[in-house]
């Protein structure tokens, strides 16, 4: 916190963040997928609360604010690498891990303070996926979040697929392209995919069960390169919110570009 204070030229407030968001191009009525880093904004009076209030004030109830609220810890221990756990623990972990609950399962720590607070806000809804949930507030939250499928949880029937057809935007609020969840949707559209089995604890008919499901093997390590190529070829809003470098761009255009980029540039070429 000391470093954040020392690097901040003046206090960031809800009002100053609101003005910066408007200057960036965020408007009333927009549907926007937000990826955020609170610390990058500088010292904020009110912290994550001020940022969330600013987003709500700009977009208003006529728009919709969406954030990824992933909880990747609810996964098969055989996949864990940071740190790995002994194989003799695996069955115990699968049998005893608490099931996903949209009300109290926390977001993965790396998702940031803003979304972790946002999910607790009144009128914010969270989708029902143990790993790849989204939270949303505003006019279209139910249409975007309802019926989130367990299998292929970032695909066409997921909240990402619904955002794609809604002329939505992506706001990188101090985050970089490697956080751009929308690029996952493009991964489902390319002709080479590796399908893997995953598992998580969920509630089925009132009972906790360990459920296996199919998912893609994702290529997040390519997202920064994809985003930089997209930025080089497309106009997007670029500016500052506080100290944070920010970008605002069309989700649909980004997904379409990423699909073509993966086909033309991904040398891995994994076949089904």
UniProtKB/Swiss-Prot annotation:
<dbReference type="GO" id="GO:0046677">
    <property type="term" value="P:response to antibiotic"/>
</dbReference>
<comment type="similarity">
    <text>Belongs to the antibiotic N-acetyltransferase family.</text>
</comment>
<dbReference type="InterPro" id="IPR003679">
    <property type="entry name" value="Amioglycoside_AcTrfase"/>
</dbReference>
<dbReference type="InterPro" id="IPR028345">
    <property type="entry name" value="Antibiotic_NAT-like"/>
</dbReference>
<comment type="subunit">
    <text>Homodimer.</text>
</comment>
<dbReference type="GO" id="GO:0008080">
    <property type="term" value="F:N-acetyltransferase activity"/>
</dbReference>
<feature type="binding site">
    <location>
        <begin position="38"/>
        <end position="44"/>
    </location>
    <ligand>
        <name>CoA</name>
    </ligand>
</feature>
<feature type="binding site">
    <location>
        <position position="113"/>
    </location>
    <ligand>
        <name>CoA</name>
    </ligand>
</feature>
<keyword id="KW-0012">Acyltransferase</keyword>
<protein>
    <recommendedName>
        <fullName>SPbeta prophage-derived aminoglycoside N(3')-acetyltransferase-like protein YokD</fullName>
        <ecNumber>2.3.1.-</ecNumber>
    </recommendedName>
</protein>
<comment type="function">
    <text>May contribute to antibiotic resistance.</text>
</comment>
<dbReference type="Pfam" id="PF02522">
    <property type="entry name" value="Antibiotic_NAT"/>
</dbReference>
<keyword id="KW-0808">Transferase</keyword>
<keyword id="KW-0046">Antibiotic resistance</keyword>
């Amino acid at each position: 916190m000391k470093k954040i204070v020392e690097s901040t030229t003046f206090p960031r407030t809800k009002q100053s963040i609101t003005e910066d968001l408007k200057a960036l191009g965020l408007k009333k009525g927009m549907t926007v997928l937000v990826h955020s880093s609170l610390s990058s904004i500088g010292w904020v009076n009110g912290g994550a609360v001020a940022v969330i209030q600013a987003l709500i004030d700009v977009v208003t109830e006529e728009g919709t604010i969406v954030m990824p609220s992933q909880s990747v810890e609810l996964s098969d221990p055989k996949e864990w690498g940071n740190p790995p756990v002994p194989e003799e623990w695996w069955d115990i972990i699968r049998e005893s891990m608490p099931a996903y609950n949209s009300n109290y399962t926390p977001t993965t720590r790396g998702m940031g303070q803003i979304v972790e607070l946002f999910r607790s806000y009144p009128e914010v809804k969270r989708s029902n996926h143990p790993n790849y949930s989204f939270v949303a507030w505003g006019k279209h939250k139910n249409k975007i979040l309802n019926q989130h499928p367990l299998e292929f949880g970032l695909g066409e029937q997921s909240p990402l697929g619904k955002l794609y057809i809604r002329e939505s935007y992506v706001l990188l609020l101090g985050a970089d392209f490697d956080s751009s969840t929308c690029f996952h949707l493009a991964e489902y559209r390319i002709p080479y995919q590796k399908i893997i089995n995953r598992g998580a604890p969920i509630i089925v008919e009132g009972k906790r069960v360990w459920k296996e499901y199919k998912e893609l093997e994702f290529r997040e390590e390519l997202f920064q390169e994809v985003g930089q190529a997209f930025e080089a070829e497309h106009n997007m809003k670029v500016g500052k919110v506080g100290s944070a470098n920010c970008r605002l761009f069309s989700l649909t255009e980004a997904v379409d570009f990423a699909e073509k980029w993966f086909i033309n540039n991904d040398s891995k070429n994994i076949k089904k």
